[in-house]
Amino acid sequence: MAINFEELHPQEQAELERNIFFTTLEQIKGWARSNSLWPMTFGLACCAIEMMGVGSSHYDLDRFGSFFRTSPRQSDVMIVSGTVTKKMAPIVRRLYDQMPEPKWVIAMGSCATAGGPYVNSYAVVKGVDQIVPVDVYIPGCPPNPAALIYGINKLKEKIRYEAKTGKQVTNK
């Protein structure tokens, strides 16, 4: 059913222009997904201490619509913080596979992004992106809670952009 706006009174036209917007269902889903991220914490080292700081009252990640979950089946974001060893790699992959679609990964800290100071060890994975596809990298050793909030906001921008354009930013 089409609405003929020319037949309306000028005041009604002005009211409609202020209160009606047109969008696609994909953009609405992208907006909803980006504003209700539920990260699963996977803290393996000192970066996990900084991740706990984000949940405290000083930074309060809840105000951005993100609530930490302990189950991968209830999460859509995995935050990997710390050194991933080769023995731990299959567990990280299994948890990632248990997450429902759509799912995203944030690599927090230099250990998760590239192996950190333990990069030359035989037992350390040289970045979590060798196990799971990473969407956002947060550098630092350890990155502060504000950097994690910035990374989560960048992930939100990425989700909205992909919903708006239909293009994937990274190759998963």
UniProtKB/Swiss-Prot annotation:
Binds 1 [4Fe-4S] cluster. It is a peripheral membrane protein. InterPro entries: NADH_UbQ_OxRdtase-like_20kDa, NADH_UQ_OxRdtase_20Kd_su. Its main location: membrane. One of its GO terms (molecular function) is NADH dehydrogenase (ubiquinone) activity. Pfam families: Oxidored_q6. Keywords: 4Fe-4S, Cell membrane, Iron, Iron-sulfur, Membrane, Metal-binding, NAD, Quinone, Translocase, Transport. Its EC number is 7.1.1.-. This is NADH-quinone oxidoreductase subunit B. It is found in: Cell membrane. The keyword Transport applies. It catalyses: a quinone + NADH + 5 H(+)(in) = a quinol + NAD(+) + 4 H(+)(out). [4Fe-4S] cluster binds at C46, C47, C111, C141. It comes from the Bacteria. PANTHER family: NADH DEHYDROGENASE, NADH DEHYDROGENASE [UBIQUINONE] IRON-SULFUR PROTEIN 7, MITOCHONDRIAL. It comes from Bacillus cytotoxicus (strain DSM 22905 / CIP 110041 / 391-98 / NVH 391-98). GO terms for biological process: aerobic respiration; electron transport coupled proton transport. SUPFAM superfamilies: HydA/Nqo6-like (SSF56770).
